[in-house]
From Swiss-Prot:
Keyword Kinase listed: no
Comment block on domains: The N-terminal domain interacts with the head of the 30S subunit; the C-terminal domain interacts with the body and contacts protein S4. The interaction surface between S4 and S5 is involved in control of translational fidelity.
Organism the protein comes from: Xanthomonas campestris pv. campestris (strain ATCC 33913 / DSM 3586 / NCPPB 528 / LMG 568 / P 25)
SUBUNIT field: Part of the 30S ribosomal subunit. Contacts proteins S4 and S8.
Protein name: Small ribosomal subunit protein uS5
Entry keyword set: Ribonucleoprotein, Ribosomal protein, RNA-binding, rRNA-binding
Length: 180
């Protein structure tokens, strides 16, 4: 049986996943080198964008900056753990379709049937996998900037509401809601 190869080229660093002792899924979305020109030349720093989730509906993102890549990643992971938000999920998918945006990044996500998988690109995929979504159809339109895409995805996920929550807000029973 052939061994599975590691991703090469552009996919090499994309969506590195790690499970830590506390059961959180950590995903590295992007690492960027930033240069600042000073009198003596250029100073290089690194930024890291990470997403952390428990796979059961909690997710957060962090953005860290440092002179070294590992330090930037660690800072962003710590920030992501501090900013966890809860998302209403429906057996591994969303309750309803949702549109959202941040800056020029626009995202569209809709629930998918069992066996579809996560059909999403780049930064959106990292967020959806970390939060625990197993089946979803998603599309990013406009800017593909990873930070704005992560923010737009999280904003969209926060807008997803279960029928029970909608009914509670309206002071009704779930059966009384008009599904049509």
């Amino acid at each position: 049986m052939a061994e599975e190869r590691a991703p090469r080229g552009r996919d090499r660093d994309r969506n590195r996943e790690e499970k830590v002792d506390d059961g959180m899924i950590e995903k590295l979305v992007a690492v960027n080198r930033v240069s600042k020109t000073v009198k003596g030349g250029r100073q290089f720093t690194f930024t890291a964008l990470t997403v952390v989730g428990d796979g059961l509906g909690k997710v957060g993102f962090g953005y860290g900056k440092a002179r070294e890549v590992p330090v930037a990643i660690q800072k962003s992971m710590e920030q992501a753990r501090k900013n966890l938000a809860t998302v209403d999920l429906n057996n591994g998918t969303l309750w309803h379709a949702v549109k959202s945006g941040h800056g020029a990044a626009r995202v569209y996500m809709q629930p998918a049937s069992e066996g579809t998988g996560v059909i999403a690109g780049g930064a959106m995929r990292a967020v959806l996998e970390a939060v625990g979504v197993k089946n979803v159809l998603a599309k990013a339109v406009g800017s593909r900037n990873p930070i704005n895409l992560v923010r737009a995805t999280l904003k969209g996920l926060s807008e997803v509401q279960s029928p029970a929550r909608v009914a509670a807000k309206r002071g009704k029973k779930v059966e009384e809601l008009n599904h049509g």
